[in-house]
C-alpha cells in the first residue's frame, strides 16, 4: 500500500509539473454492487495512468486498486507500475518498467514484483515489440516473454495481437496466452473488442458507447468465457453516460452475469477522466494482460 500511495503522488506531481509534455492521462473511480442469491458484494475500483515526454525520453506511471467487500470481509488488490522509454533512430524505442502486485485477502497479504525490458519498432503504420519480464522468486514463475504486432489504421483506430509465454519455476509446465484487440476511439462512438486464449480457456469481450448528443450517450458491454468449449460465464450490460466537461464524464451501467445457471445482477456507477490513452507501442506486457483480460472476462467495473 505504501508503494501505491507513493507512486500515485509521483504521477500526480509529474503530470502537473510537465503538463506541457503530457502525452496522455486518464483515470476512473467506480463503485459496483453485485447481488446473487441474496449475497451482496461491493466493489470499489480506482485506476489512474499518465505519461509524458521529455525529448526522446518518455516516462509513465499506472495505478490500479480494487477492493471487494464480501459480506464484511475485504479483499484488496493493487497494481503499481513505473517505467521509462527511449526513442531512437526515428522508428525504434526501448523501455524498462517495474510493476508490483499486492493482495490482501482475509488478513493474509502477498506481493509479486515484475521487472520488464522491451524493444520495439514503429513506422507509423506497423509496429512490433518484443519483451522479457523477470518475476521475483517464489512467485510460481521465472519469466514472462511477449511479442506484440500492431496495425494503426488511423489516429482513432488500431488493432493488435500478442503472444505471451509464462515460464514456470522449478521445471513446472509453461503456459501460453494470446491476446487480440481492436480499438476505435472516435467523437461519436468508441468500441473495444478483446479476445484472450490460454490453453483450454477462451474469452471475448465487447465494450462500446455512442454519443446521442454532445452531453448524453448510451453504453453497453458483452463478455463470454469458455473452458474446454463449455460456456461458463456470460455477461451483458447496458447503461448511459453524461459528459460533465471535456474529458470528464459519469457512467452508469446495469448488468447481469450468468455462470453455470446462477445469475448475478449488478450496477456500476463511475467517474471517468480521459485525456488520451497509452499507445499500443508503449504498452507493456502487464498493460496488455490487465486490460484485455479484465474486459474479455467482463471485469470492467
Q: Whereabouts are the PLM-identified features?
A:
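Residues on the lipid-exposed face of transmembrane beta-strands in outer-membrane beta-barrel proteins
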Residues: 48-52, 82-86, 117-121, 147-151, ...
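Repeated loop/turn-to-beta-strand initiation elements of outer-membrane beta-barrel proteins
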Residues: 23-25, 55-61, 89-96, 123-130, ...
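Residues that define the transmembrane beta-barrel architecture of outer-membrane proteins
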Residues: 40-46, 76-80, 110-115, 124, ...
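Flexible, glycine-rich linker and terminal segments associated
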Residues: 21-26, 170, 194-198, 219, ...
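Gram-negative bacterial Sec-dependent N-terminal signal peptides
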Residues: 1-20
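Short glycine/proline- and aromatic-enriched beta-strand/turn motifs that initiate or cap beta-hairpins
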Residues: 19-71, 91, 157, 294-301
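Outer-membrane beta-barrel pore domains and translocons
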Residues: 28-34, 62-66, 97-101, 122, ...
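Detector for outer-membrane/organellar transmembrane beta-barrel domains
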Residues: 125, 129, 142-227
Amino acid at each position: 500500500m505504501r508503494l501505491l500511495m507513493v507512486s500515485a503522488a509521483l504521477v500526480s506531481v509529474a503530470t502537473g509539473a510537465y503538463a506541457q509534455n503530457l502525452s496522455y492521462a486518464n483515470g476512473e473511480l467506480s463503485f459496483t454492487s453485485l447481488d446473487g442469491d441474496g449475497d451482496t458484494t461491493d466493489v470499489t475500483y480506482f485506476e489512474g495512468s499518465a505519461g509524458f515526454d521529455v525529448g526522446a525520453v518518455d516516462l509513465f506511471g499506472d495505478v490500479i486498486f480494487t477492493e471487494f467487500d464480501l459480506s464484511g470481509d475485504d479483499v484488496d488488490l493493487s497494481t503499481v507500475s513505473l517505467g521509462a522509454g527511449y526513442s531512437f533512430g526515428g522508428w525504434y524505442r526501448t523501455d524498462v518498467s517495474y510493476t508490483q502486485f499486492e493482495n490482501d485477502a482475509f488478513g493474509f497479504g502477498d506481493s509479486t514484483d515484475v521487472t520488464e525490458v522491451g524493444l520495439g519498432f514503429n513506422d507509423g503504420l506497423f509496429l512490433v515489440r518484443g519483451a522479457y519480464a523477470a518475476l521475483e522468486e517464489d512467485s510460481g514463475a521465472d519469466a514472462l516473454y511477449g511479442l506484440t504486432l500492431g496495425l494503426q489504421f488511423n489516429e482513432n483506430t488500431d488493432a493488435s495481437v500478442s503472444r505471451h509465454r509464462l515460464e514456470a519455476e522449478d521445471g513446472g509446465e509453461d503456459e501460453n496466452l494470446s491476446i487480440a484487440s481492436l480499438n476505435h476511439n472516435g467523437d461519436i462512438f468508441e468500441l473495444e473488442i478483446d479476445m484472450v486464449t490460454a490453453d483450454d480457456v477462451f474469452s471475448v469481450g465487447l465494450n462500446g458507447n455512442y454519443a446521442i448528443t454532445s452531453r448524453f450517450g448510451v453504453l453497453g458491454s458483452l463478455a463470454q468465457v469458455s473452458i474446454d468449449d463449455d460456456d461458463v460465464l456470460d455477461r451483458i450490460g447496458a447503461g448511459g453516460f453524461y459528459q460533465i466537461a471535456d474529458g470528464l464524464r459519469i457512467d452508469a451501467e446495469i448488468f447481469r452475469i450468468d455462470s453455470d445457471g446462477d445469475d448475478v445482477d449488478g450496477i456500476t456507477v463511475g467517474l471517468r477522466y480521459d485525456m488520451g490513452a497509452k499507445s499500443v507501442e508503449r504498452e507493456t506486457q502487464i498493460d496488455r494482460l490487465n486490460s484485455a483480460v479484465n474486459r474479455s472476462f467482463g471485469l470492467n467495473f
